[in-house]
Curated annotation (Swiss-Prot):
Biased composition (Low complexity): 600-620
Induction comment: By stress conditions e.g. heat shock.
Any one GO molecular function term: ATP binding
Protein name, UniProt field: Chaperone protein DnaK
CDD domains: ASKHA_NBD_HSP70_DnaK-like
Biased composition (Basic and acidic residues): 501-528, 621-637
Length: 637
């Protein structure tokens, strides 16, 4: 049996490691470097270059040199307008999926990533002297299902069986904590890489690595800092020469390399000079770009990016149910954490010096290799418990999202609940699967829909439909629905969630906070309407069953109160629905008192309670609880 290698498939650079005995080893590539640029180039002669070879020729072959492909993984064309502007190569849409066009051929991001993974695979094979077929590959913690699936697909294209997809901050924590199994620590892993930002809070102890919460921004990384410098340099040159260098692919590539170099130099120097001779030429002769940039200027230009760093940190600590003071260590991961301002912000927020004991460029690959060792059995006494970043559920009566799996739930996990029908003789139900944090279905992301047919006709609330959500260790969701009476089952693996962008995720969370009062009001309105609907249903049922036993006067009053409630229900105004419900319940109580000569609970009130138990989402977590989903009535006639 061969080794399971660990690969950090990064936006800017990639790295591969493997367990040798009890120790993880980072493997240098053929050029002698321990990290490999995540770049692929296609030359005029048809040759394909990967890594350093691609980077060396990028200036003279800018439109055919692909970098930052990770930003396009598992994303539709609609989700990457800003990313498309940042690259000199052509991004086109095929079925609304982002594709790279080179000449007359298009490549999927998975294909390009597979070329990088092949390079890492070959690097490992050269080192080990044997074939490698299995790997653990890391992804940003905030990657959605489609992005994770795209990463798995890239591995398969590269000839690798992807044994596990794990989150980058979690992998870093594994590497950091491997020799600290006996200590009990609460660790925040701050991961700012080339294209993404993640923050995870973990609890380490006795070999258990438990993720308490995770947050992040998949549109924030070193590329964004580079882009701001590129725009600054281009604008400065335009002021002097009235020429926009961004329209020249070769000049733009030179600007990109100069911006990245300046950013790196400003991490150790207070100022740097960008000097690009012969950047372009006009009728008057060659033009040169010379611009001085101070660290203060850089920090001022990038202020908006620095501001975006702290909010995910606040949410991650809050969702972990911890105080910032309870965090024992802050581990920095990713090359962009070398920026002094980033380190300053982290220190100020957490109130302690960040831990820089790990190599930010290699630690994620090391963690992936350790996880490979765990899966292989070479590493024992280590248990990794990761989480899902967003809540998952289905739409129920009144357009409410009923959550089955809460955000930051440890995965793998399975949760099931029992729901029922919303109408008499309903023979088909539609399961509307949602992801997000808002109470109303319309405010959340639709992951998919599917139907369960063949339900025997029965009164509403009688059929029992068991809905199960199952998230595997890779974070991929499976949903099934089963009719308990017939045993008929329908299931689906959710991959449509790939259409969920980071912008949408951030919007969901921010909206959930800023619209909290509005959401609460909407939820109360729906709950009131659902209760009224259940009361109407149960009252009509009771009238049909025992109406002839009621005194005529009381029956008339009940019918009048019922009609008023129906009218109020049609208006949707809770201010009129609640008094109408109270009036109907009062009439039932009076009728019941006369019937039984006692102050016993009214049949209508009892019926309402019973129907409410079936007809709307209750807060109980029991699996056998019957809830009323917003299912679609299918006419079989």
């Amino acid at each position: 049996m061969g080794k399971i290698i660990g690969i950090d498939l990064g936006t800017t650079n990639s790295c591969v490691a493997v367990m040798q005995g009890k120790d993880p080893v980072v493997i240098a590539n053929a050029e002698g470097y321990r990290t490999t640029p995540s770049m692929v180039a296609f030359t005029k002669s048809g040759e394909r270059l990967v890594g350093h070879a691609a980077k060396r020729q990028a200036i003279t072959n800018a439109t055919n040199t692909i970098f930052s492909i990770k930003r396009f993984m598992g994303r539709t064309q609609d989700e990457v307008p800003e990313e498309t502007k940042m690259v000199p190569y052509q991004i086109v849409s095929e079925g609304n999926q982002a594709r790279v066009k080179i000449g007359d051929k298009t490549h999927s991001p998975q294909e390009i990533s597979a070329m990088i993974l092949q390079k890492m695979k070959e690097t490992a094979e050269d080192f080990l002297g044997e074939k490698v077929t299995e790997a653990v590959i890391t992804v940003p913690a905030y990657f959605n299902d489609a992005q994770r699936q795209a990463t798995k697909d890239a591995g398969q294209i590269a000839g690798l069986e992807v044994k596990r997809i794990i989150n980058e901050p979690t992998a870093a924590a594994l590497a950091y904590g491997l020799d600290k199994k006996q200590s009990n620590e609460k660790v925040a892993v701050f991961d700012l890489g080339g294209g993404t930002f993640d923050i995870s809070v973990l609890e380490l102890g006795d070999g258990v690595f438990e993720v308490r919460s995770t947050d992040g921004d998949t549109h924030l990384g070193g590329d964004n800092f580079d882009q701001i410098l590129i725009d600054f340099l281009a604008d400065e040159f335009k002021k002097q020469e009235m020429i926009d260098l961004r329209k020249d692919p070769m000049a733009l590539q030179r600007l990109k390399e100069a911006a990245e170099k300046a950013k790196i130099e400003l991490s150790s120097s207070a100022a740097t000079e960008v000097n690009l001779p012969f950047i372009t030429a006009t009728q008057d002769g060659p033009k040169h770009l010379v611009v001085n940039i101070t660290r203060a200027k850089f920090e001022g230009l990038c202020a908006s990016l620095f501001d975006r760093i702290l909010e995910p940190c606040r949410r991650a600590v809050k969702n972990a149910k911890l105080d910032v003071k309870e965090i024992d260590e802050v581990v920095l991961v990713g090359g962009s954490t070398r920026i002094p301002k980033v380190q300053q912000l982290v220190k100020e927020f957490f109130g302690k010096e960040p831990n820089r004991s790990v190599n930010p460029d290699e630690v994620v690959a090391v963690g992936a290799a350790i996880q490979g060792g765990v899966l292989k059995g070479d590493v024992t006494d280590v248990l990794l418990l990761d989480v899902t970043p967003l809540s998952l559920g289905i739409e129920t009566l009144g357009g409410v999202m009923t959550k089955l799996i809460e955000a930051n739930t440890t995965i793998p996990t399975k949760k099931q609940e029992t729901f029922s029908t919303a109408a008499d003789n309903q023979t088909s139900v539609e399961i509307h699967i949602l992801q997000g944090e808002r109470p109303m279905s319309t405010d959340n992301k639709t992951l998919g829909r599917f139907h369960l047919d063949g339900i025997p006709p029965a009164p509403r609330g009688v059929p029992q439909i068991e809905v199960a959500f199952d998230i595997d260790a890779n974070g991929i969701l499976h949903v099934s629905a089963k009719d308990k009476a017939t045993g008929k089952e329908q299931s689906v693996r959710i991959e449509a969630s790939g259409k969920l962008s980071e912008t949408e995720i951030e919007k969901m969370k921010k909206d959930a906070s800023s619209h909290a009062d509005e959401d609460k009001k909407k939820k109360e309105e729906v709950d009131t309407k659902n209760t009224a609907d259940a009361l109407i249903f149960s009252t009509e049922k009771q009238i049909n069953e025992i109406g002839d036993k009621l005194p005529a006067e009381n029956l008339s009053k009940i019918q009048a109160a019922l009609d008023r409630l129906k009218e109020a229900h049609k208006t949707g105004n809770t201010a009129t629905i609640k008094p109408a419900m109270d009036a109907l319940t009062k009439e039932w109580n009076e009728a019941a008192s006369k019937m039984y000569g006692t102050e016993a609970g009214a049949p209508g009130a009892a019926g309402a309670a019973g129907a409410a138990g079936q007809g709307q989402s209750a807060s109980s977590g029991k699996d056998d609880e019957v809830k009323n989903a917003d299912f679609e009535v299918v006419d079989d006639k």
